[in-house]
């Protein structure tokens, strides 16, 4: 097919398993600064990038926005809801947007501050291709064919470990069986971002997975550079650089560096006291200036921040001492408490230094499950973790407008850390909502959520496989001297001023989740390895502190917690439990007071019974077991007379199962009439003596349970 006036460029990336990723540019969205379509199988992603020609006055940061969205039409679906159209991004789309943002943001020039938007859209879906692993590749392809200043290329891949092998960009069915799943972002030379979940794996396995992913990304980076050359975009646009006064910068450094260093060296554990100390040095410097000085106060603030950063980093590298006086591996003081909220189904407080989480656990039924309806996925989620970060946690005034992208990301990390140790559904039929409210924050609040969430689950009586703890690691490097220091349990300032934020969660056995963002080039795998080993020691220390509060799950639920059990029944008996028009299941709920749900899954019926008291639960369970229990010849049952005829009575000996008690089987003596023998509703003990092989009808006997008259007479004599 010809495309008059268009210059279309195509490139191909071959995955290790032989599948091919196609990159096409020049056909769609040509008025954007850059656009590209990435295709794998039937999955197609359109990415566009647009950047303003000039930065807005006074902007001293990178105003980058990344939005990933899935069109429902991409998978032949119409959106739900009243409007029937795509609206605000879902949490799933926000998480993918964050993956791309975190990979690309560090690679823009430090002084490039023009508004930049990356829009990534799934326009065709494939059930065997997860689009999140292609989103960054598509965004970089669009960036490569634009003139926007960018120190790329960068790309992302998913890597899993399955049966001892690493697989790049696996199919969903493979991911479900994997013991490790990571999304890794990297340039040709450096790993930039890592995020994923694992089934209690070793640090070595995780490190090897990152290396395999990086090798696959290098192949993609080579093709992306070829794409850039083919598009003629190797030269990027010029832009207005930041205004700097290098003489002023040196003057400020000479005047205040030592004072700032001494404030940092005090090792005060209170962040507000430290902040006041740094502010006092800055204030004194400004007050020392002549009244008629012409120096820019904005530049003074910027350069003073640089001095602060250098002083704190040098303190760590020179004296192996940190802002709050700790050594490099030292963990802040920890205290925790469970059962703090008497009416919650489970609760815990976890405090580490100046970071505190109050976390609750709430039980619900299947009716409380979170409904998921997206272009790629439809279903229900029975485990939820919500993370809240109010302004007061950092002493700030901030309007409460619901969770932002940061809250969604932090909550997802904690969710992935904990879900790996949740018991199987047959042991834990509840829908569970975990809510972490951060009451104080000075670094590692997501890791505090993991610790508090674990304690709250154990307080609630959920039999998790093992308790999980989490720690945030940091890094300070000096490329000139080659010195570096890995920090355990970082403060907010150490995160801000450092070169790495590496969060690791796990049990005593191994890692369950991780999230890493690296801000420095040339980070070696040796340093990563040390960070992982140091994190392991920190995690185990935190875990030991948690166990002092609660080492294992409580034996039983709280007295006020709802009760729920799940039983499996044969698939063919689902209809028997439900009854015609739902009559039987409604009757069970009415008479017992419990809520009963039933569904077919894995070629079996799964019945969940939910109640706020044990009596109602036992009643419903007894009735359901009666329905699904297969009658056995020779067994004795206590039944109820349902109707009486001239030739006998029909007795319900199990719920929904009636048998004929013939007039000849009621007594040993001959009966000519049923009048006055039995009454409807009367309870009678019977024995199942036969099941008709042709009709399946049941024949009951009462007299076989009564001694014969001659036996009775002999006994009496």
UniProtKB/Swiss-Prot annotation:
It catalyses: RNA(n+1) + phosphate = RNA(n) + a ribonucleoside 5'-diphosphate. PROSITE patterns: KH_TYPE_1 (PS50084), S1 (PS50126). InterPro entries: ExoRNase_PH_dom1, ExoRNase_PH_dom2, ExoRNase_PH_dom2_sf, KH_dom, KH_dom_type_1, KH_dom_type_1_sf, NA-bd_OB-fold, PNPase. SUPFAM superfamilies: Eukaryotic type KH-domain (KH-domain type I) (SSF54791), Nucleic acid-binding proteins (SSF50249), Ribonuclease PH domain 2-like (SSF55666), Ribosomal protein S5 domain 2-like (SSF54211). The keyword Metal-binding applies. One of its GO terms (cellular component) is cytosol. One of its GO terms (biological process) is RNA processing. Keywords: Cytoplasm, Magnesium, Metal-binding, Nucleotidyltransferase, RNA-binding, Transferase. Residues 634-703 form the S1 motif domain. NCBIfam families: polynuc_phos, PRK11824.1. This is Polyribonucleotide nucleotidyltransferase. The gene is pnp.
């Amino acid at each position: 097919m010809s495309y008059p006036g268009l210059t279309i460029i195509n490139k191909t990336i071959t995955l290790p398993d032989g599948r091919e990723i196609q990159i096409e540019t020049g056909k769609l969205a040509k008025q954007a600064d850059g656009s590209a379509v990435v295709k794998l199988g039937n999955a197609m992603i359109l990415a566009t990038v647009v950047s303003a020609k000039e930065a807005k006055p006074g902007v001293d940061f990178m105003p980058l926005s990344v939005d990933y969205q899935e069109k429902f039409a991409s998978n032949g679906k119409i959106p739900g809801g009243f409007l029937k159209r795509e609206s605000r991004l879902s949490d799933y789309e926000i998480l993918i947007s964050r993956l791309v943002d975190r990979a690309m943001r560090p690679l823009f020039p430090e002084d490039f501050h023009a508004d930049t938007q990356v829009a990534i859209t799934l326009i065709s879906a494939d059930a065997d291709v997860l689009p999140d692993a292609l989103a960054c590749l598509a965004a970089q392809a669009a960036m490569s064919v634009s003139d926007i200043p960018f120190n790329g290329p960068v790309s992302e891949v998913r890597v899993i470990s399955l049966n001892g092998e690493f697989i790049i960009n696996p199919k969903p069915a493979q991911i479900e069986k994997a013991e490790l799943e990571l999304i890794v972002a990297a340039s040709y030379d450096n790993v930039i971002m890592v995020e994923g979940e694992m089934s209690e794996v070793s640090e070595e396995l995780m490190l090897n997975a990152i290396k395999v992913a990086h090798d696959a990304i290098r192949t993609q980076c080579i093709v992306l550079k070829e794409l850039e050359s083919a598009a003629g975009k190797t030269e990027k646009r010029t832009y207005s650089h930041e205004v700097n006064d290098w003489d002023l910068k040196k003057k400020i450094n000479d005047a205040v560096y030592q004072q700032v260093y001494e404030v940092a060296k005090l090792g005060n554990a209170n962040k507000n006291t430290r902040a006041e100390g740094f502010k006092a040095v800055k204030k004194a410097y400004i007050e020392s200036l002549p009244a008629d000085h012409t120096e820019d106060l904005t530049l003074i603030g910027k350069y003073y921040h640089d001095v602060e950063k250098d002083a704190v980093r040098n303190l760590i590298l020179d004296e192996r001492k940190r802002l709050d006086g700790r050594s490099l591996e030292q963990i802040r003081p920890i205290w925790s408490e469970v059962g703090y909220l008497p009416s919650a189904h489970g609760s815990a407080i976890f405090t580490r230094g100046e970071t505190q989480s109050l976390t609750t656990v709430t039980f619900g039924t299947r009716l409380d499950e979170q409904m998921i309806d997206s272009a790629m996925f439809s279903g229900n989620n029975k485990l939820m973790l919500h993370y809240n970060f109010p302004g007061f946690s950092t002493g700030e005034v901030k309007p409460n407008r619901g969770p932002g992208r940061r809250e969604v990301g932090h909550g997802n990390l904690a969710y992935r850390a904990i879900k790996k140790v949740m018991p199987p559904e047959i042991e834990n039929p509840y829908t569970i909502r975990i809510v972490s409210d951060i009451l104080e924050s000075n670094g590692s609040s997501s890791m505090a959520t993991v610790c508090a969430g674990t304690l709250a689950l154990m307080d609630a009586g959920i039999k998790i496989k093992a308790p999980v703890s989490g720690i945030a690691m940091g890094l300070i490097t000096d490329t000139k001297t080659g010195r570096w220091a890995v920090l355990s349990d970082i403060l907010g300032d150490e995160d801000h001023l450092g070169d790495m934020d590496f969060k690791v969660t796990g049990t005593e056995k191994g890692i369950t989740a991780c999230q890493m963002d690296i801000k420095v080039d040339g980070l070696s795998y040796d340093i990563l390895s040390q960070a992982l080993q140091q994190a392991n020691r920190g995690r185990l220390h935190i875990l030991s502190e948690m166990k002092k509060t609660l080492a294992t799950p409580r034996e039983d639920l709280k007295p006020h917690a709802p009760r729920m059990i799940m039983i499996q029944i044969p698939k063919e008996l689902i209809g028997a439990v439900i009854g015609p028009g739902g009559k039987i299941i409604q009757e069970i709920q009415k008479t017992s007071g419990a809520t009963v749900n039933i569904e077919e899954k894995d070629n079996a019926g799964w019945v969940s019974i939910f109640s706020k008291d044990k009596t109602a639960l036992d009643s419903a369970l007894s009735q359901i077991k009666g329905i699904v229990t297969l009658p056995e010849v020779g067994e004795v049952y206590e039944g109820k007379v349902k109707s009486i005829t001239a030739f006998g009575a029909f007795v319900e000996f199990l719920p929904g199962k009636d048998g004929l008690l013939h007039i000849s089987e009621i007594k040993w003596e001959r009966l000519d009439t049923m009048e006055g023998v039995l009454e409807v509703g009367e309870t009678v003990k019977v024995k199942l003596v036969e099941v008709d092989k042709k009709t399946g009808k049941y024949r009951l006997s009462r007299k076989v349970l009564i001694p014969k008259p001659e036996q009775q007479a002999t006994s009496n004599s």
